[in-house]
Amino acid sequence: MLYPEEFDVIVVGGGHAGTEAALAAARMGAKTLLLSHNIETLGQMSCNPSIGGIGKGHLVKEVDALGGAMAIATDEAGIQFRILNSSKGPAVRATRAQADRVLYKAAIRHRLENQPNLSLFQQAVDDLMVEGDRVVGAVTQVGIAFRARTVVLTAGTFLDGRIHVGLDNYQAGRAGDPPAVSLSARLKELKLPQGRLKTGTPPRLDGRSIDFSKCTEQAGDGMPGGAGPMPVFSFMGRADMHPQQMPCWITHTNARTHDIIRSGFDRSPMFTGKIDGVGPRYCPSVEDKINRFADKESHQIFLEPEGLTTNEYYPNGISTSLPFDIQYQLVRSMPGLENAHILRPGYAIEYDYFDPRELKSSFETRSIKGLFFAGQINGTTGYEEAAAQGLFAGINAALQCRGEEAWLPRRDEAYLGVLVDDLITKGVTEPYRMFTSRAEFRLQLREDNADMRLTEAGRKLGLVDDARWDAFSRKRDTVSRETERLKSIWVNPRNLPAAESERVLGKAIEHEYNLADLLRRPDVNYETLMSLDGGKYSAGSPLSEIEIEQIEISAKYSGYIERQHDEVERAAHFENLRLPADFDYSQVKALSFEVRQKLDKHRPETLGLASRISGVTPAAISLLMIHLRKGGHKAFNRDAATEAAAESQPAQ
C-alpha cells in the first residue's frame, strides 16, 4: 500500500539520533515522519543509565543550544548530577548525570508527541525506495510505502545485529528487540561500503541483593557528602526540575575476579573468533581489560541506580560477553556482591556500520541523493554522539527540502563540527567516542559557552523557540554589558586604598588598571572584585551565577582565546575554499600517487577537508592550491574571491 500522504523528511529509528533528527526537522517546519519498530522504546537508554561526561557533555550542551531535547530531558530525569574535572580548567569541565530510564524515555516521548509537523508510526522498515540515484521513501515490514523527499537512517545496532553470550549467539537489534536484517541486506545491495563493529553491556543486578555497607558511597553534587551546587544540563533547565537524587556506589575487582574471568577465555566469543567486529577502545569489556592490563590488580566498578521505581543496578565496568556461568561467578567475587542476583545477563552485540568517509559534509550519502545517515551507523558509540549526529542530519535534511545550502559548523565553532569533520575525513576503525582532546580549539569550545556559540545559528535555522531565544538574548546582553562596564572602570594607586588592593589582589597596585584586567588575575574572582572599596564598583543589578561564570572565564582566558582565534584565521584562507566536484587530480603531476589516489577516492568538498585526510600533506595542499589558481578554475577562483572580499570587510 502507498500511504496517501507524502513527507519532507522520514526518520528511520527512534533512538537518540532518530529522536533528535525528527524533532529538529519538524522544528524547522519540515513535514516529518518518525518510523520506529516500537513506539514504546522511543528514546530508550539501551545501555548505561547516564548522559554526559568528558567531551560527551559538551555535545549535549551544543544539542541543547540548538533547541534539542537531550539536556532538558536529562534535567527532568536525572537522579544524580556531577561536574567532572571540576578542579581543572573550564575547557575540560564536563557535566554527567545518572538518569532514571523510565523518566528519560517519558520526557523524550512527551516532546515527540507534542511537536508540531511530526508524526509517529510504529513499523520496522525493511526497504528503501530508490529511483535512479535518489531515495524517495521507505517501505515497512508489512508493505506500507511512505514517500518522502529525504530519509534519515538512524538504525543504531539493529542492522544485521547479533548478540553473543559465551559461544551462544542469536540475531537481535538489542536484548528483546528484533534485528533489521532486510534493511541491512538492502543497503548492501546499494553498494554502500560497510563493516562490522561491536559493543557490549554488563549484567544487571538486583539492588536488594547488594550489601552496600561493603561499598563506597559516591554522592552527586548538591547532595549531602557531595560537592555543590547541583548542576543542570540545559540552558533552560533548573535544579528544581530534578527528581529525587540517589547515590552511586563503588566496588572493585580483585585477583579472584581476574582468575575467574581468565578461566572463561576459552569460551569467550572475543578470543575464539566468534566476534569479528571491533569494540570501543575507551569502553572495553571486562575480559578485554583483564587481558590487556594483566599487571593491574584491581579495577573500579561503579554501581549505578537504574531509576527511582526499580531496584535494578548497572555495574559500570564489567561489560562482558563471557558465558553466563562465568558472569555469575565474577559478579559474586566482588565486595558487596557476594550474594548479588543477576536480573539480566551481559552480552556483546555485533552490527553493520557504513564508512562515514562516503558521506558528504552534510551526512548525505554520496551515492544516493536525499539519504542521510546518523548515529552508530556511522561508526560512533554513545548516546551523546548519536544525538548530535541526529540533530545535524535532521537539520540538513530539512534544509535540502527547502532548497538551501547545508549547515556545516567548523571545528573551531563546535564539538559537533569536530565530530562531523573527524568522521568524514578520517573514518573509523573502531567505535568513535568524543573527547575534549580531539578538539584543537577546545579553549573556546566549552560547555559554559555552547549557547553563545550556537544559539544564534539555531535561531536562524528555525530550531530555537521564542522562550529560549529571549533567555539567551538576556544572558548575552547582560554579559556583554557587564564586560564593557568592567573595561571602562579604572583604578590606580591614588583612588584605590592600598589596604583594599592588598585584601582583594594580594598586593598594592603600582599603576592604573581597569577592572577587566584585574579580573584576569588567577586569584581574583568577580565577587571579591565587586567588594573593592566598600562595593562602590558593583553592578547596579545582581547577576546570575551563570552570567558571572561567563564573565570570569572570558576575562581569564582572553589571551589564550585570542591566540586561538589567530590560529583559526591563519587556517581560514583555505578552509572553506571549495574543490570542483569534477576535478581531475591526475592533472597535478607534482602530487604523489598516494595523495592523488586518496583525494580521488574521498573527493573532499573543500581544501580544509582535503588537508585532514590521512596522508595528505601540507605540501600537497599548497600544490593543489597553486594548480587550481594557475589553472583558472572558475568555481575555485570565485570562492577565493568571495573569501578575500569577506576578509577585507570591516567588522560590523
Curated annotation (Swiss-Prot):
It comes from the Bacteria. Its cofactor is FAD. GO terms for biological process: tRNA methylation; tRNA wobble uridine modification. Its main location: cytoplasm. InterPro entries: FAD/NAD-bd_sf, GIDA_C_N, MnmG, MnmG-rel, MnmG-rel_CS, MnmG_C, MnmG_C_subdom, MnmG_C_subdom_sf. It is found in: Cytoplasm. Keywords: Cytoplasm, FAD, Flavoprotein, NAD, tRNA processing. GO terms for molecular function: flavin adenine dinucleotide binding. FAD binds at residues 13-18. NAD-binding protein involved in the addition of a carboxymethylaminomethyl (cmnm) group at the wobble position (U34) of certain tRNAs, forming tRNA-cmnm(5)s(2)U34. Homodimer. Heterotetramer of two MnmE and two MnmG subunits. PANTHER family: GLUCOSE INHIBITED DIVISION PROTEIN A, PROTEIN MTO1 HOMOLOG, MITOCHONDRIAL. This is tRNA uridine 5-carboxymethylaminomethyl modification enzyme MnmG. It comes from Variovorax paradoxus (strain S110).
